[in-house]
Amino acid sequence: MDMIKSCTSVKLGATCRREGTTFQVWAPDAVHVKLALYESPGEYNEQGLVTDHESGTLYLMERNGDGIWSAVVNRDLHGTYYMYQIESADGGVHYAVDPYATAVSANGCRGVVVDLAKSNPPGWEQDVRPKLLKPTDAVLYELHVRDFSIHTDSGMKYRGKYKAFTEGGLRDSEGNTIGLDHLEELGVTHVHLLPIFDFRTVNELDGYATGSLSREYNWGYDPQNYNVPEGSYSTDPMDPILRIRELKELILALHAKGIRVVMDVVYNHTYTVDDGPFERLAPGYFYRKDGYGHLSNGSGVGNELATEKPMVRKYIKDSLRYWAEEYHIDGFRFDLMALIDTTTMKEIVSELRREVDSSLLFYGEPWTGGMSPLTEQTVKGSQKGQGFAVFNDHFRHAIKGDNDGHGRGFATGEPWYEGAVVEGMMGSIHDFALHPDETVNYVTVHDNLNLWDKILVACGMEEQAGLLRMTDGKLVNGGDVWKATAASTPYAGIPDEDVMSAAAVRRSLLANGIVLLSQGIPLLHAGDELLRTKFGDHNSYRSGDAVNAIRWSNKKRFKPVFDYYKGLIALRKAHPAFRMAAREEIEEHMEVLRSSDRIIAYRLTHHPQDSWGQIVVIVNGNEHEMTVDLPPTPYRWSIVVNDRQAGTDTIKTLDQGVIAVPGLSLMVLYEDQTQKKQGLTTVEIEYERRDEAYDGWNVWVWGTGVEDGGVPFSRVDGGKARAVFYAASGTKRVGCIVRLNDWEDREGENDWFIDIPPEEAKVRISLLSVKDDGSEGQEQRDMAS
């Protein structure tokens, strides 16, 4: 253990300089280690693999006492291929790719020495991260690189590639934005990319040409070379430098649009053990074992990385630091984060925020894929106060129901979920979160049925929609998937002339509308704003482009849906009251008004950074219109979100204290303090104390017909203070008490009542305190019209 601890500060991998390259690798049990250099990537077999590595030029490596083997080659090796030759105690000889390699040949068969400065695109040194003040300011958008552009209707030159994200100015036949400009117009702050490190299950040599509709497809949760970009997204996987440059171009293009990049990382398992990145160098060390000495399987794919071990922890932290520094990655989403011990997660967050960038975002799945012997699992609750967030499956279930079946939630028609939805909308601070920035709120992501398909299934519409039955990327009964998707009718029943009237559309907007109007960090699945379908495939990890590709033609067909998403995101970004960072803020400024009969209503009041003093959000899960009482106020209400449109502009104003909310819809209103309701009487109380000690004094009023409760005094000229409130038309008498703070003291022993004469526009009352000099209080009435 002392040996291992001393290794955790050593820089491993290949360090390339013009004068020479240093190689360092940790292989503690090896008898001999040699560096093998090659001029070519080797001979590929039919499976796209290089299995013969005997042709390299060998260099002896020296071992120090810590199990680290080193070699220096005194020349510029940029672009040279390399491997490590490992001789074990039993005499066996194996070749291994450097787990710290930053470039590899096609399909990751050999490492490549690279001078990373030569991979930088123009403008890279001037790249800056878009501003992010706090995690709850984020709006996340989960997206697969290939899905984004591969369909022919995208009109992109670099379909399926990193470079598709650099293509600006694209429009459809009706002038709607496509691709990169679409993301900017939508308003998301972060694009969360599914795995972009080198993964195993796609042969980069099979149909890698731009726009190829090859069957080769995978989400990428099968890691091979953790510190290298995936080659199938490059325009030429045979060029080991090009994939690095093109990924940097992607990040540069998104940053230029004000969009940050989150990387989906999989440090819980590798695709294989024997042929994976670690086992040949440190047999038995990197993988977790059960009590019988067998590989544990908490990932569900046959192995788990032993993150609690020092050199595994070092590897993960080094890898994350590399991506954040070299690629300017802005955040990380951790797959099956419960398989990463909490000590490692805490160190990741604290060290990278302290030493790289304080605004880096960290979040992940707080569950496993099976039983694990790890005792210190990063599950819901373990994130409290630690600076990272977790996916909120409680909220997800309350909104939509189960993942793949007919189970329903609030947005899909089930009663009794109001309380669970309210809990989620309050940032789950009374559930598992200490603060709202610890919960990632979402309805669907890449796993399971996507939102549109889930709504169809939950509402019993799958046969009408012609949803497919698929498993492992194939139709259950055989056949061509492209033909099957073309014959499917997932949008049957949506009238082209009035998209927003369809119940399924309204349910989809209700579901993600709840997410976007909740405290916490919202996450959307790419294409939800276009009513994206995966044709009923609940596990499309290898189902190919026919199922997974985003259909950009949906934008002009469902433009009102896109506009609604765009408006909700703009509303959230414009008003800090929707993005509170601390539980104390929520407890002070958020009040639940109603949570029953499939109606949820809450108000946000007097948030100090928000220009709107009072905001009311109403969610109607009924299929019919419901009437909801609004909080009393002397001002008119301005509606900015209804069942047809959303944003920050006023749709309609109203004087009434009730509102009719259409079925399956959202309503957002704010108190417009520039427009006072008609027929109100202003009541002004002028309060005088000889000691002029007005701090904490307020007037408690009731019977106003507008807004009852405490009204603070504000100091005015002449050593006096003034409180102003309003009485509704027809009010005859208003009660009041002058008190200190929350009833610590009061003026007089009896309640006071103020008569409100009809037709009076203003009533003034003057009070002289009896508390500071012992004299009798004096009262003077001044009626003013």
Segments predicted by a language model, with ranges:
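The feature marks proteins involved in alpha-glucan
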Residues: 1-18, 44-45, 51-56, 64-170, ...
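Carbohydrate-binding surface patches
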Residues: 15, 19-31, 591-631
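Conserved, mostly hydrophobic/aromatic
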Residues: 25, 84, 143, 193, ...
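C-terminal beta-strand-rich structural cap/linker in extracellular carbohydrate-active enzymes
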Residues: 27, 79-80, 652-679
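C-terminal accessory region downstream of the catalytic core in glycan-modifying enzymes
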Residues: 38, 500-505, 509, 550, ...
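Conserved alpha/beta catalytic core and glycan-binding cleft of carbohydrate-active enzymes
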Residues: 114, 349-526, 530-531, 539-541, ...
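Substrate-binding/active-site clefts of carbohydrate-active enzymes
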Residues: 146-327, 337-357, 361, 373
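Glycan-recognition and catalytic regions of carbohydrate-active enzymes
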Residues: 508, 514-520, 524-536, 549-615, ...
